[in-house]
């Protein structure tokens, strides 16, 4: 049964240009050779690659593991420090005065450039402040800041002294913040008086106050960065609240903090998943393996060169911001753009303005942003100079072929490879991806595994699907990789049950995938997003991809609903592009497209014209809510605090009620 991605793939295999291949960090031949070594002789491969990092003490054993019982240990006995690898190692080189962080504020008139030496000095000073407040190795520090340089400085300062940082996205509510405080029990909180997003102020200190009032934990110290300068209505508790700038300007504060020598398996950070499926999980990453994963993938996936300016649009509140805005770039000595704003402010040309302003060479963003900007047309793009770009990236969800083609043609001008990266908070670093000078791309496919990663497809009985040709199944990973999570913080049982119990001997990703005849992987969506229509398994992502092939459609989300005859029917929420009129003609067009690209079995039973879709702030569609609305369960929708725009849900409920009446 063909689907949109397969149809597109048969038409389009996009190979890197001869010029790109000539200058790339790796060739296809070397990729195949190194990948083979990484699977057949992982100890040799990872021992060599670990020398990319600076170790205070070398490891005694590369890898010990009992994967069936979720026990993994990398670089046993090795000692290192993350901030040392991101900063100190560069200070005695010509990189000392190279731009490390290029900060672009929400307001286009605000910007800052911090060199490696600037960041090094700030991190040392703030590390000493943390120590002054009694923070020591193993203590947790909760960070609730906007996208400003102090966010990167804070987490690097934590790594310098061995404290475990837990960054909470600045858009989360006081309730979401409180649940994370209760779970990780921080010694100290770092926040700001407020922030800006899309020209609008966001309250941060106030949210921290509300969270701490309700929290079971008694946090004694809150350090506040002055971002807005608006102190009206700011509650201040002497003895608890301290201004960041006041502390940093203390003339007696030492300018150097000796980096803590950390064991490779010492905890580095806790990052909570979005909470779209019940209680948030505190994903725990450790020091050596995580940093090596972020460092190595950044070098190869983004084909980084010393002169590049690189921009990952993700917030540091998400794992993409951790790995590919801070730790991956800085450990490689790269210049990393950090953006406080949104793509639509002050107008829909903001991304292109930033690329033009800084001469960005490598651009890494999410399909959600790409599709939103597609709706705005080409006018904003044509006014900007994007000629500096040489590589594009996609992250967060599968990119549908139409968005891929638009991105390739209009942003990359047909010359920039696109790395469509599949990975998770839990994996720590990129797992399946094209290497841009080596692996030909297929629009919509994540392509092939990174070094040391063994993705397999298993059936529902846990049997590995080894057939050649086109096959589908549950995406699992066979064997350990350095940057994998080591546990759910404070809940080892949940770690095993969530990731290792369903398919014995494998890490279960929760995603479904298809592997084509060339061995390329196509992510078809979460396994719980599979709709069983008359005994046929239909991936929601497949239907969504077909729907958005229509030039009138901006976005689509598909869920199953109870059907008297078929067991489950297909219900499609469809958002059209600006200026498009919704009518029965368009509805028939969409159904016809799905039938043509997948088959009649996949035709939507209902098309619901949606003004928007309920998404988390990281861009993930909350299908759990959509399923409940379809079923008429308008109450008890669960935690909606992670939604970017809760009003969308109410509108969908009203539409559904009208539809029923």
From Swiss-Prot:
Coiled coil stretches, renumbered: none
Post-translational modification as stated in the protein's UniProt record: Acetylated. Deacetylation by the SIR2-homolog deacetylase activates the enzyme.
Listed GO biological process terms: acetyl-CoA biosynthetic process; acetyl-CoA biosynthetic process from acetate
One GO location term (cellular component): cytosol
Pfam families given in the database record: ACAS_N, AMP-binding, AMP-binding_C
EC number: 6.2.1.1
Binding residue positions for CoA: 197-200, 320, 534
Database matches in CDD domains: ACS
List of residues that carry N6-acetyllysine: 620
Binding site for ATP: 396-398, 420-425, 511, 526, 537
Annotated binding of Mg(2+), by residue: 548, 553
The protein's role, per its UniProt record: Catalyzes the conversion of acetate into acetyl-CoA (AcCoA), an essential intermediate at the junction of anabolic and catabolic pathways. AcsA undergoes a two-step reaction. In the first half reaction, AcsA combines acetate with ATP to form acetyl-adenylate (AcAMP) intermediate. In the second half reaction, it can then transfer the acetyl group from AcAMP to the sulfhydryl group of CoA, forming the product AcCoA.
NCBIfam families in alphabetical order: Ac_CoA_lig_AcsA (TIGR02188), PRK00174.1 (NF001208)
Cited PANTHER family: ACETYL-COENZYME A SYNTHETASE (PTHR24095), ACETYL-COENZYME A SYNTHETASE 1 (PTHR24095:SF14)
Classification via HAMAP family: Ac_CoA_synth (MF_01123)
Protein's name in the database: Acetyl-coenzyme A synthetase
Phylogenetic lineage: Bacteria, Pseudomonadati, Spirochaetota, Spirochaetia, Leptospirales
